[in-house]
A protein has these predicted regions:
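Active-site beta-loop-alpha junctions enriched in small/polar residues
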Residues: 86-88, 114-116, 144-149, 180-185, ...
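Histidine/acidic residue-rich metal-binding segments in metalloenzymes
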Residues: 124, 157-179, 186-253, 260-281, ...
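Solvent-exposed alpha-helices and their adjacent loops that cap or buttress functional pockets
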Residues: 14-16, 34-35, 61-63, 132-133, ...
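Divalent-metal coordination cores built from histidine and acidic residues
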Residues: 2-4, 9, 95-206, 533-535
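Active-site microenvironment of metallo-dependent hydrolases
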Residues: 1-39, 44, 102-104, 292-308, ...
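Short coil/turn connectors at secondary-structure junctions
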Residues: 17-19, 63-66, 72, 76, ...
Length: 606
């Protein structure tokens, strides 16, 4: 904090100059004192400069203010911080994501844009950063640490430690920290490149490294924590979460669209509520249809409260704990950077709440003192798109480069005893089975879409055979999945974590081929009996729509109805279900362009 800013804040805090806004008659959610107490809050230039509690501070008088907002006994809570998310997984661009998130009380997002980086490299990250500048909320971008997710993944880009360092030097302050470190073997083996990437975080404002450590324990967990990785959002059982807490890590309880881990982890908190100080919330991946209807971090608060967590504790986890994890809660810094609590010297991210159940959207949401949402409706401003953002967006609209494919590629037989993916609805993890027959199974394929297959075909990879067969096992993976009950057709998507090759699941070769052809330059598609019955277009990198959150939500709802009619029954989410099947960093069995991959052994499974 500069001396000039400090003097301005102090003068306002002492009441020597009028404040901009005074919130009165509020029930203040005090996350430091772990209480709710009546009082008033003064804001100047987007910063909280004064908090006065009724009774205790009556002698201090009040503040002269340009605007007085009577909260009429409503609760006043700190704005929510999403500790880990991928904006691209909401299928909307950052400025649109911010508009949506603001309506549900998220005023800060810690965003890892490794989705677009896996498609378009650092140019993709630049698009996210520049588009995010238009947002009325604060988006803190983390440098993707694992592009690709594994060294031999067939992604659209590679970001090395040297690339990171050059980007930090060229764009100082634009990246907040290092995103989730998914290369577990690289950490455990002290791989020089992996260590250099972790060390690169020292060039960022936060100097923090986010984590990704599903089922990691013992000496491996010791090594992971010793590397300086501060947090993890992959725990699915209380014992796993407690292991990480005990090693000094923050645990993010994930409540998204695909993964719902919060309730499973809650016994750890209920057994000892003091643990909540080192726990926070993350959505990771949240579809607009879910975000708009049931919420984001506010939904995590609701779920936590429903399973028995005290509301003030839940709000603290949604704000202060996350701020502490990333070093955003203290220090003699620009007060616009400090957040996570209603306290002097913090950014004025504030929620006015009718109650503490989170059954509905916040009554009002303020970001840096400005009203941005009321009763679930966005009322703030999103800045116009700049020429730079428009140019970067145009470059992202030609990202799908698929090889020529014949029907023969999609028509293959099941081999008794071969490794099959077992879908686990509501979880990012999968199982592995070795059935003796194909009953209940569906074909699954992953087709590289970043141009490698196209280049190999140009060199004659297929010989005189049908188009694409020469790429099988190299750039086209084929296998089987159980629990993905699509019937009479196929589903395909250009989203396939994290390299985002084209994934297709179906019960017949013809519809699978038609679905792959239908994805075009990006999107989710459903094909039934040769007919395209539903589509969500995602032109930006094959990941994001150019439309609004409401547009995508409506398309998603239609897609879900059509998918249910094709036999994909709850609790399996057809979109979230398919897009995580290629993810090679979460156990157990995954599909890659080379074939079926056992994450637990890092070997290909026959």
């Amino acid at each position: 904090m500069s001396a000039e800013v400090m003097r301005s804040v102090i003068d306002a805090a002492e009441g020597r100059v009028p404040v901009d806004t005074l919130f009165t008659n509020a029930q203040i959610v005090d996350v430091y004192g772990q209480r709710v107490a009546p009082g008033s809050v003064a804001v100047k230039d987007g910063v909280i400069v004064g908090v006065l509690y009724d009774g205790r501070d009556d002698a201090a008088g009040t503040y002269e203010a340009t605007e007085v907002i009577d909260c009429q006994g409503r609760y006043l809570a700190p704005g929510f911080i999403d500790g880990h998310l991928h904006i691209e997984s909401s299928n909307i661009r950052p400025a649109e994501y911010a508009r949506m998130a603001a309506t549900r009380g998220t005023t800060t997002a810690i965003a890892d844009s490794h989705e677009i980086a896996n498609v378009a490299g650092l140019d993709g990250l630049r698009f996210m950063i520049e588009d995010g500048r238009r947002a009325p909320i604060s988006i803190k971008y983390m440098m993707p640490s694992c592009v690709p997710a594994l060294p031999d993944e067939q992604a659209g880009a590679v970001i090395s430690a040297a690339d990171m360092q050059a980007f930090f030097a060229e764009h100082p302050g634009d990246v907040f920290g290092l995103g989730e470190m998914m290369n577990l073997p690289g950490v455990f083996m002290a791989d020089p490149e992996t260590c250099a990437r972790i060390d690169a975080a020292n060039q960022t404002p936060s100097k923090q490294v986010d984590g990704h450590a599903p089922l990691v324990a013992g000496k491996d967990l010791n090594a992971y924590a010793a590397a300086g990785i501060i947090a993890d959002h992959e725990s699915t059982i209380p014992e796993e979460a407690l292991d990480k807490l005990s090693r000094g890590m923050y645990v993010m309880l994930r409540e998204g669209t695909c993964s719902h881990d919060l309730a499973n982890l809650s016994p750890m908190l209920l057994e000892n509520p003091a643990r909540a100080r080192r726990c926070c919330f993350a959505t990771d991946d949240r579809a607009p249809s879910d975000a708009l209807s049931t919420g984001m971090i506010d939904n995590a608060c609701r779920v936590a409260i429903e399973v028995g967590v005290d509301p003030v504790v839940a709000i603290s986890m949604a704000s202060l704990s996350t701020a502490e994890a990333f070093g955003l809660d203290h220090g003699c810094r620009d007060p616009h950077e400090l957040r996570g609590a209603i306290a002097p010297g913090k950014r004025a991210d504030l929620l006015v709440l009718n109650d503490l159940t989170f059954a509905t959207a916040p009554y009002r949401v303020y970001a840096a003192g400005a009203l941005v949402a009321q009763d679930g409706t966005f009322v703030g401003e999103v800045a116009p798109e700049t020429a730079e953002v428009a140019a970067l967006a145009d470059e992202l609209c030609a990202s799908v480069k698929l090889p020529k494919l014949s029907l023969d590629v999609f028509d293959y037989a099941f081999k008794p005893g071969e490794a099959v993916i077992d879908v686990v609805p509501g979880k990012a993890i999968t199982g592995m089975a070795r059935p003796e027959n194909a009953e209940g199974l569906r074909r699954i394929m992953l087709i590289e879409r970043h141009g490698r297959g196209v280049s190999l075909q140009a060199e004659g990879a297929d010989g005189d055979g049908p188009a694409g067969l020469g790429l099988v096992g190299k750039h086209i993976g084929r296998g089987w999945v159980r629990g993905f009950t699509i019937t009479g057709g196929a589903i395909a998507s250009t989203i396939g974590h994290d390299s985002h090759n084209v994934c297709v699941v179906g019960d017949n070769a013809a519809d699978m081929m038609a679905a792959v052809e239908a994805v075009g330059q990006g999107g989710h598609v459903l094909v039934r009996n040769g007919e395209l019955v539903a589509r969500i277009p995602l032109a930006l990198g094959g990941l994001m729509s150019e439309g609004t959150a409401e547009d995508v939500a409506a398309q998603h709802d239609d897609f879900m109805v059509k998918a249910r009619a094709m036999g994909i029954e709850p609790p399996l989410d057809p979109i979230m279900g398919i897009i995580f099947l290629p993810l090679p960093v979460i156990p157990t069995l995954r599909i890659r362009p080379e074939g079926m991959f056992d994450v637990t052994t890092f070997t290909y499974a026959d």
